[in-house]
Amino acid sequence: MTPTLARFLDQHGFARDQLSATGPDGRFTPLMRACKEGRLDIVEELLTLGADLSVLNSDGCNALWLACYHGSHAIIQRLIDAGIALDNQNGNGATALMYVASNSKPDLVKLLLENGANPALRNFDDFSALDLAASLECLKLLKKAA
């Protein structure tokens, strides 16, 4: 473990010997926090050390959702390459693709679709990413993929 990772873990209240455990509030694992903050260096080291990609936070989201929140293409692609569940549905049935479409992030819609995200999935309110698209660009990308 590098000193940089050790500082990151300490700063956010994570145990150094439980790299896949959620912190005291149950909202983030170290990997999720690093994704949310756009820390590719920390993401890389955590993956190298075996951080579990299947862990979900209290909302049912995996680290991909937090990477999409930040918007780092490099982190999103790294998680996908490492085998993260691209179509994980959270506690509301929403996927990362639905999130980026509803937040008008067409570059991320394109990235997720190119990597195999399923645009046909529906959340628990029966909406798809296409239904939730918040911009014309997102709408066009999703219609083309449908």
Language-model segments: residues:
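Ankyrin repeat boundary/linker residues
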Residues: G23-P24, N57, N90, N123
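Ankyrin-repeat-protein effector appendages
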Residues: M1-H12, N115, F124-A146
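Ankyrin-repeat inter-repeat connecting loop/turn
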Residues: R16-L19, L53, L86, P119
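Intrinsically disordered, low-complexity regulatory segments in ankyrin-centric signaling systems
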Residues: M1-E37, E44, T48, A146
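Start-of-repeat signature of ankyrin repeats
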Residues: G26-R27, G60, G93, D126
